[in-house]
Amino acid sequence: MRIGLLGGSFNPAHAGHLMLARRALRALRLDQVWLMVSPGNPLKPSKGMAPFRVRLASAERIADGRRIVATDIESRLGQRFTVKTVGLLKQRFPHVRFVWLMGADGLAQLSHWKRWRRLAAMVPIAVLPRPGSVSPALRGAAASVLRHQRRPSRESPVLAERKGNAWTFLSAPQNDISATALRESGQFRPDSDQE
């Protein structure tokens, strides 16, 4: 089984996340994408962050529950750091081929993550475009350090077969919807269940 892990705050989950998940399913020939809702991103301020259950519910609304699955597994594992979560998932599911999915904005910030080089060695990474983030991401510290591990996008269908030390940039239409814009417009109220 091949599973893409799309971690994030999902404050809220939106059509852009769904578009990225669908693109990853096709390009990487994945069986599933897990929308892993973070219990608390150490790099994001807690001010304005909706309660975990509200963010999980927003991810569940965009997931189909079959190929795109919203999950609280990071919370259940008691983790907040991706490198620890991925390590535990690989132990619990030794026959699953995981791929870490991230937007270009995530790649631009990757060098600030805890043990990010270890993460890149543990699991292949697929990066998807985000408006305004592609160029800074590809010129950033992580992309520079990992430049020799970058695989051409034509190899994306077999990326999941690698154990790590490989990443690719997938082309995809860019959707400029953002969780920040949804919160600022009042379409998502962090203090409510939105039901």
Swiss-Prot record:
> What family name appears in the similarity comment?
Belongs to the NadD family.
Enzymatic class: transferase
Q: Does the keyword Nucleotidyltransferase apply?
A: yes
Return any one Pfam family short name.
CTP_transf_like
> What keywords tag this UniProt record?
ATP-binding, NAD, Nucleotide-binding, Nucleotidyltransferase, Pyridine nucleotide biosynthesis, Transferase
Extract one GO molecular function annotation from the record. Answer: ATP binding
Q: Which InterPro entries match?
A: Cyt_trans-like, NadD/NMNAT, Rossmann-like_a/b/a_fold
Record function comment:
Catalyzes the reversible adenylation of nicotinate mononucleotide (NaMN) to nicotinic acid adenine dinucleotide (NaAD).
Q: What is this protein called?
A: Probable nicotinate-nucleotide adenylyltransferase
Query: What reaction is this protein's catalytic activity?
Result: nicotinate beta-D-ribonucleotide + ATP + H(+) = deamido-NAD(+) + diphosphate
Tell me the Gene3D superfamilies matching this sequence: HUPs
What Enzyme Commission number(s) does the record list for this chain?
A: 2.7.7.18
Q: GO biological process annotations for this chain's record?
A: NAD biosynthetic process
Q: Which gene encodes it?
A: nadD
Pathway annotation from the record: Cofactor biosynthesis; NAD(+) biosynthesis; deamido-NAD(+) from nicotinate D-ribonucleotide: step 1/1
